Structure formats: C-alpha cells, structure tokens
Amino acid sequence: AAHFHVDMSDESINTAMQKWNAFVNVIQTIGELRKKRYPPITGTEFHQLVMASLASPKDLILPYSLDFQKELEGRQGIQNCRARLMVVGGHLHDPEFIRMIESQGALVVADRFCTGTIPGFHPIEPIGGNPYKTMAEYTFARTLCPRMMEEFDRRLNTIVDTVKEYRVDGVVLEIIKFCDLWGVDSMPLVTALRERGIPVLKLEREYRLCAEGQLRTRVQAFIESMGK
C-alpha cells in the first residue's frame, strides 16, 4: 500500500464502502423503474450505467447518476415493446449485446449476470467493525457464479423470483464461448425454467459481438414463439 501510495486504513476502507452504498442506492432506485408496466429506461441504457460504474470511482460517477435518475423521473414510459425479457449469464461488458436484443422490439427489464446488478449491487453491511471481513463476506456471499455448484437452487430461485417481480415474458441465457462453468450450468437451468413455464432462449456468444444477423434472427424467432 505504501509503495502505491494507497491508504488501506480501516477508516479509508469504511469511507469507500459508504461511497459504494450511496451509489448502490441510486442504482437500485433506477432499477426499480424497470418493474413498471411502461419502464422509462431501456436495458441498454441501464447496462451502460452499470459498466460505467465498474470503471469509475463512485464519487465521480454519483453526480451523473443522480442527474440521470432525475431525468428518468420526467420521462414517459416505453409502450411499444413486443416482449419483456430478462438476460441471464456470465459477465457481459458490452451494452451492444443488449442493444441487439432490443433492436427486435424487445425490452430487457432485468439481468442476472455473475457480476451484474441482481447479485452484485447491494449495500455493504458492516460485520463486527472489521472492514476486511466485511468485504470478504460481501464478495463471496453475494456473487452467484456457477463455480459455486451447491448454489444452483439459489441461482434458479433468484431468476424465477425476478421473472415474477419484473413481469418477464421470457429469459435469454447468454453463454460466452468456452465458459465451461455456464456451459455445464445451462442444461439443468434451461430445463428447470421450462418446467416452470418460463420460455428460454439459449445463445452462445463470442467475447466480441459478432454474427449479429444470426443472433437477431434467433431473438426475433424467440419473441414470435411466445406469441408476441
């Protein structure tokens, strides 16, 4: 810490966690708007906000997030979407993937990525005054990655509950190529969701967005298969 001139004192870490919590409160408030019958925000916009938050210090991005929140309060809701979708899968850094899905008339109203908003964006609750223990508990207890094999039911229930809460019509399961963890997890996940009457589209993607025409065709066919 001294070599990089970084303050790693308990006070400094606690301050950083407070800044995180302030930002998370804004993200959660904006995310709640996606539950509306006519959300004022697209999935692409929300994903852009999330990606910016992962690359920027929270005290720098917070003012812009608050301004965006105020802007959304004055917006009219999106009424012309064909289907409300939830995107599930590994870490997704490219908002263009969401934009591609929404270009077919869908609206992405929820996500469940390994490091996405549902498992990752929660306030940090202090544990016994030890900030290091608090951060460790937050990191390992919140992240719902398939590498935690015993957590399958928890991941499944999180998705099912979100489908109900956000009035989702169908789930898009995106798997980055060669990610064995999601590759293995996807088979029982697709089966379990379909058994519960939830339509699922499984898409395998490259790290970079490519074969857009094929992806658009599959998304369009998925929406039509739901009668939308």
Per-region residue spans from a language model:
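Redox- and metal-dependent alpha/beta enzyme cores, enriched for Fe-S-associated oxidoreductases
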Residues: G89-I159
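A charged, amphipathic alpha-helical module
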Residues: A1-F121
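Proline-aspartate-enriched helix->loop->beta-strand connector
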Residues: V163-L173
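Active-site proximal loops enriched in glycine and acidic residues that flank catalytic Cys/His/Asp
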Residues: G89, R112-F113, E174-K177, E204-Y207
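Peripheral docking tails and interdomain loops at the edges
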Residues: M187-K228
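Glycine/threonine-rich flexible loop motifs
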Residues: C179-D185
